[in-house]
């Protein structure tokens, strides 16, 4: 799965940020991307384990992969479905 994360076209470092900042930054980053592009999010806020999947579902983006077993958490999302 590590190769999957390494293949992301964009990356967002949200380490040290707390809710709601990580999701606000994800939204801003995704807005600048084209449909189908991928974003790797690296975060350590436990709230992201709930917030990022919910954001993807609500905004119609695809959560391709996530690693939430240990920090830093990693999320790979694709803009659009």
UniProtKB/Swiss-Prot annotation:
Pfam families: TusA. One of its GO terms (cellular component) is cytoplasm. InterPro entries: Sulphur_carrier_TusA (IPR022931), TusA-like (IPR001455), TusA-like_sf (IPR036868). One of its GO terms (biological process) is tRNA wobble position uridine thiolation. GO terms for molecular function: sulfur carrier activity. Keywords: Cytoplasm. Its main location: cytoplasm. It comes from the Bacteria. The keyword Cytoplasm applies. The active site is at residue 19. It is found in: Cytoplasm. HAMAP family: Thiourid_synth_A. Belongs to the sulfur carrier protein TusA family. Sulfur carrier protein which probably makes part of a sulfur-relay system. This is Sulfur carrier protein TusA. It comes from Shewanella pealeana (strain ATCC 700345 / ANG-SQ1). The gene is tusA.
């Amino acid at each position: 799965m590590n190769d999957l994360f390494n293949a992301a076209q964009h990356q967002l470092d949200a380490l040290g940020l707390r809710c709601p900042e990580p999701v606000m930054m994800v939204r801003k980053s995704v807005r600048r991307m084209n449909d189908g592009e991928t974003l790797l999010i690296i975060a350590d806020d436990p709230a992201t384990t709930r917030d990022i999947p919910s954001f993807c579902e609500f905004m119609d983006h695809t959560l391709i992969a996530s690693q939430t077993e240990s920090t830093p958490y990693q999320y790979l999302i694709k803009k659009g479905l």
